[in-house]
């Protein structure tokens, strides 16, 4: 296999990172909704923590996307 085909295989594998970020964010907000349903008085604190966690999970997906773009255009 030449380097170009290996590069595109690596780019395809980067999709796993983006898929993982999507699963992480969906898990965070699913847990947030069930936690707020159980304890509505803690909604403000839970929402703040969920947004921080979602931002960190989404950052991993964006890093994976940036690396894939670097591989495509290098």
From Swiss-Prot:
Cited SUPFAM superfamilies: F1F0 ATP synthase subunit C (SSF81333)
CDD domains in the cross-refs: ATP-synt_Fo_c_ATP5G3 (cd18182)
Subunit structure as annotated in this protein's UniProt entry: F-type ATPases have 2 components, F(1) - the catalytic core - and F(0) - the membrane proton channel. F(1) has five subunits: alpha(3), beta(3), gamma(1), delta(1), epsilon(1). F(0) has three main subunits: a(1), b(2) and c(10-14). The alpha and beta chains form an alternating ring which encloses part of the gamma chain. F(1) is attached to F(0) by a central stalk formed by the gamma and epsilon chains, while a peripheral stalk is formed by the delta and b chains.
Family (UniProt): Belongs to the ATPase C chain family.
Entry GO CC: plasma membrane; proton-transporting ATP synthase complex; proton-transporting two-sector ATPase complex, proton-transporting domain
Subcellular location(s) per record: Cell inner membrane
Primary localisation category: membrane
Membrane topology classification: Multi-pass membrane protein
Taxonomic source organism: Rickettsia akari (strain Hartford)
InterPro entries found in the cross-reference section: ATP_synth_F0_csu, ATP_synth_F0_csu_DDCD_BS, ATP_synth_F0_csu_sf, ATPase_proteolipid_c-like_dom, F/V-ATP_Csub_sf
Gene3D superfamilies: F1F0 ATP synthase subunit C
Role played: F(1)F(0) ATP synthase produces ATP from ADP in the presence of a proton or sodium gradient. F-type ATPases consist of two structural domains, F(1) containing the extramembraneous catalytic core and F(0) containing the membrane proton channel, linked together by a central stalk and a peripheral stalk. During catalysis, ATP synthesis in the catalytic domain of F(1) is coupled via a rotary mechanism of the central stalk subunits to proton translocation. Key component of the F(0) channel; it plays a direct role in translocation across the membrane. A homomeric c-ring of between 10-14 subunits forms the central stalk rotor element with the F(1) delta and epsilon subunits.
UniProt name for this protein: ATP synthase subunit c
GO molecular function annotations of the record: lipid binding; proton-transporting ATP synthase activity, rotational mechanism
Site keyed Reversibly protonated during proton transport: positions: 58
Keyword field contains Secreted: no
């Amino acid at each position: 296999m030449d380097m170009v085909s290996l590069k595109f295989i690596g780019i395809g594998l980067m999709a796993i990172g983006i898929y993982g970020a999507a699963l992480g964010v969906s898990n965070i907000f699913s847990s947030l909704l069930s936690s707020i349903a159980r304890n509505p008085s803690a909604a403000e604190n839970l929402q703040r923590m969920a947004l921080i966690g979602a931002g960190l999970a989404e950052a991993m997906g964006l890093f994976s996307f940036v690396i894939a773009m670097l591989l495509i255009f290098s």
